[in-house]
Amino acid sequence: MPHSDAIAASRPLNDQHAHVRTTFMARLKPGAHLLNGQCGMGEDLCWLRAEGYVVTACEAVLADAKVASQQSGQAVRVCPLAKMHSVLPYDGIWLSRPLDSDVSTLVPLLQQLATLLKAGAPLCFPLPPSGKISLAQLQQLVTTSGIALQLAPMEAVSASTSDSSNQHATQYVMLLRGDHQAT
């Protein structure tokens, strides 16, 4: 039985993120090896597997990792994103939750994630809904820190998690791994 058959088809895809997902997938080859970081309870993990990608998933919270594993039919590493290592670089990284916007932790984490990617590979994640870091601030941070990532062209995409209010809107950002190593 193919691994994707284990995915519960009854869960509807959260199509409020359809444009972001499509933009991310456009940069990938069929069967690409991806990291689904901070996978939560596995909604994005199931989506990525259903699209035919080989996915390594990690989640720091044991209870969430167990649910994600049950939902997806595959093992999920119980590991904070900052501790992830891989012998072979990934073709892409999709983060299911925002990164911490504190510069003292964000810079080293972005540097770490850059080392996990092949040259030109995408890293896609939601910005914190709190607005603590804007797209412009993130771009400046990446540029001035010498991180081997660059902002990818992607329309400003916001996905509201509530039809009646925009207070829960999530803006996604995509960075691409540069050809040079992080300094």
Model-derived features: positions:
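Conserved beta-strand signature within the Rossmann-like core of class I S-adenosyl-L-methionine
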Residues: 120-128
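Core SAM-dependent methyltransferase catalytic element
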Residues: 158-183
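Conserved alpha-helix/loop element of class I SAM-dependent methyltransferases that forms part
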Residues: 13-31
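A short glycine-rich, Lys/Arg-flanked "PGG" loop and its adjoining helix->strand segment in the class I
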Residues: 107-119
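A short acidic, Gly/Pro-enriched loop at the edge of an enzyme's catalytic core
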Residues: 82-93
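Conserved class I S-adenosyl-L-methionine
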Residues: 30-40
